[in-house]
Amino acid sequence: MLENLSTEHRNEKTMNLDEMNIKEVLQSMNEEDRTVALAVEKEIEHIEKVVRVVIQSFEEEGRLIYIGAGTSGRLGILDAVECPPTFGTDDKMVQGFIAGGLKAFTKAVEGAEDREELAEEDLKSIGLNEKDTVIGIAASGRTPYVIGGLKYANSVGASTASISCNKNAEISKYAKLNVEVETGAEILTGSTRLKAGTAQKLVLNMISTASMIGVGKVYKNLMVDVQSTNEKLVERSKRIIVEATGASYEVAAEYYEKAERNVKAAIVMVLLQCEYGEALEKLKEAKGFVKKAL
């Protein structure tokens, strides 16, 4: 029942929200937002377990699939679409599905989240299999679309995890691993795009970033698989080579072109003074880890 969910409770500190001036509203929001990271901190052990499973999927050439409705679905898609430019993944490695399809990203699709079968259809469309990990996201922890997706994922042997913002969430029953970040009452009653949405974004950031580190997408704290899809990222790529090798900007730019804009290869070439082909071979042997290739 909705009334039993902490995310649906009224916030005692903001009973007079409509009477506050603008500054008071903003201060109230900021005060509540400060509690979110602390709530996430309590779930780090559970988040770690999810990351380990995602890394295993990636190592087996499986995928990470997010499913959710409304804000939760949008956050999953947001995290997924940032992976190719940041970590050089293909667009299949991390995917996000939202109840109602992509059109629901910009406009609510009435009733879509209440249909379990829609998630099964979405997951069947990508040939979900036992190598994949499916993460169901729902602030309330009871969204039928997410439950349907988790049920189907379990039926094909995929790894499953859930992210919710209430304890003892319904979706937790359908996932092997659970992250339950209790964010409590929102300043605007039931508006889970606020603290709950912020918590979900923080958790998704953790899962995708830590998983990518785990499969060699990062060297030191540099995103060495960055894709140079625009002028800003071309410059960032050259700066990454400078930071990783200590070479001058001019040398970094030279090796960036020699390596056919492959930042990892350029770093190996500079540090080992080898040719492009040899750098690629070393990276292949090291399964993409720059440190091991060196």
Swiss-Prot record:
GO terms for biological process: amino sugar catabolic process; N-acetylmuramic acid catabolic process; peptidoglycan turnover. Residues 54-217 form the SIS domain. Its EC number is 4.2.1.126. It is an enzyme of class 4 (lyase). GO terms for molecular function: carbohydrate derivative binding; carbon-oxygen lyase activity; ether hydrolase activity. The keyword Lyase applies. Pathway: Amino-sugar metabolism; N-acetylmuramate degradation. It comes from the Bacteria. Keywords: Carbohydrate metabolism, Lyase. Specifically catalyzes the cleavage of the D-lactyl ether substituent of MurNAc 6-phosphate, producing GlcNAc 6-phosphate and D-lactate. Homodimer. A lyase-type mechanism (elimination/hydration) is suggested for the cleavage of the lactyl ether bond of MurNAc 6-phosphate, with the formation of an alpha,beta-unsaturated aldehyde intermediate with (E)-stereochemistry, followed by the syn addition of water to give product. Belongs to the GCKR-like family. MurNAc-6-P etherase subfamily. HAMAP family: MurQ. This is N-acetylmuramic acid 6-phosphate etherase. It comes from Bacillus cereus (strain 03BB102). The lineage of its organism: Bacteria, Bacillati, Bacillota, Bacilli, Bacillales.
